[in-house]
Amino acid sequence: MIVTTTPSVEGRQIAEYLGIVSAEAIMGANFFRDLAASITDLIGGRAGSYESKLREGREECLRELVAEAARLGADAVVGVDIDYEVVGESMLMVTASGTAVRLR
């Protein structure tokens, strides 16, 4: 399945808009404690553990987005937007949304 942040798929026409699809992933209460414990992972100014958790949340959301679009009979999800938000003091929420479409 094609998943893109653009509003269309180059070289293909959108035959039908099937609706908005969305997914959420929440990283649990130990996320920030684990992050603080792994600050030693800083390599070249980057926190490897933090990036790993963000990537894990993003990948989970995209998997769910594709699954929801497939249930609708979509060929692609266009206009994908991914957001990150801290919830409370101890959780991170990753959300993804887009429009499921059928292509010609």
Curated annotation (Swiss-Prot):
Domain of life: Bacteria
Pfam family, one: YbjQ_1
Gene3D superfamilies: Hypothetical protein apc22750. Chain B
SUPFAM superfamilies assigned: YbjQ-like
Annotated family: Belongs to the UPF0145 family.
Name the UniProt record assigns to this protein: UPF0145 protein STH1265
Species the sequence originates in: Symbiobacterium thermophilum (strain DSM 24528 / JCM 14929 / IAM 14863 / T)
